[in-house]
Amino acid sequence: ITYTDCTESGQNLCLCEGSNVCGKGNKCILGSNGEENQCVTGEGTPKPQSHNDGDFEEIPEEYLQ
């Protein structure tokens, strides 16, 4: 499974979509209401790219540099 990185902002909130990155070694955990996402160290919540459980889209290599 590939995890989607995110951008840290404000009170450690982040966007878990697009090409945003949370920072080296950090991943995004989705908030229960879909708003209060957090950047944390290590593996976070995988971001589904479709309505099928377990169906994830890999992060393009250029975003992992």
From Swiss-Prot:
The UniProt annotation puts the region (Disordered) at: 39-65
Could you tell me where the Acidic residues compositional bias lies?
55-65
One Pfam entry for this protein is Hirudin
Put simply, this protein is called: Hirudin-2B
Alphabetically, the GO molecular function entries are: serine-type endopeptidase inhibitor activity
Alphabetized, the UniProt keywords read: Disulfide bond, Glycoprotein, Protease inhibitor, Secreted, Serine protease inhibitor, Sulfation
The family assignment reads: Belongs to the protease inhibitor I14 (hirudin) family.
Give its localization.
Secreted
Where in this protein does the record put region Interaction with fibrinogen-binding exosite of thrombin?
A: 55-65
Q: What is the annotated signal peptide range for this record?
A: none
Q: What cystine linkages occur within this chain?
A: C6-C14, C16-C28, C22-C39
Residues annotated as glycosylated are T45
* GO cellular component assignments: extracellular region
Give residues where Sulfotyrosine occurs: Y63
InterPro entries per the UniProt record, alphabetical: Hirudin (IPR024793), Hirudin/antistatin (IPR011061), Prot_inh_hirudin (IPR000429)
What SUPFAM superfamilies has UniProt attached to this entry? Leech antihemostatic proteins
Q: Where is this region: Interaction with thrombin active site?
A: 1-3
This chain's function reads:
Hirudin is a potent thrombin-specific protease inhibitor. It forms a stable non-covalent complex with alpha-thrombin, thereby abolishing its ability to cleave fibrinogen.
